[in-house]
Amino acid sequence: MNLTGGITWHWLAWRSQARWAPTSNAIENWLMQQAQAFKPEAVEGQPNLLLIGASAGWMMSSRWLGQFARVDTFDIDPFAGMLFKWRHGAALKAQGTELHCHTQDAMQNLPALLSKHPKACVFFDNVLGQVRFQHPANDWQVVEKKLQQLKVTLKGREWGSVHDRMSGPTLETIAEGSC
């Protein structure tokens, strides 16, 4: 059983939107600031985006996604694509952004995916922080090596990653920007 997918998980995410709003807004503000400073030299016109670990885009902003000519989402959850289209489809269409949702593990064949989309920007949404859970706790060197190799694989390409620091209540308030 995967606790980060399935209809129950999405129902809980939908019900938690108000509680997540400050985090979603902080992510949107950060992404929009990055967009202002970002102009990839290898891309003419509007760039395309590969959104890996998209889920239903619960923490993503339609405004930020709409700056891309085309958005391809990738998630292993079979409900993710349908719900992503429900959440962002109309807004992206109104902004002239093509949306293509894929049910697959993009991390398994990332080099081929990057070859297929040579000029696309890449954004990892709650994916890279989970790599450590795919290995025994004492294999931290393997995890570190995988993440270092990812930097090499993505060299020369615009890319980014976000992973929420806490998924649940905390004992103390965590100041925005302290991550």
PLM feature segments, named:
Residues 115-117, 137-159:
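A short glycine-rich, Lys/Arg-flanked "PGG" loop and its adjoining helix->strand segment in the class I
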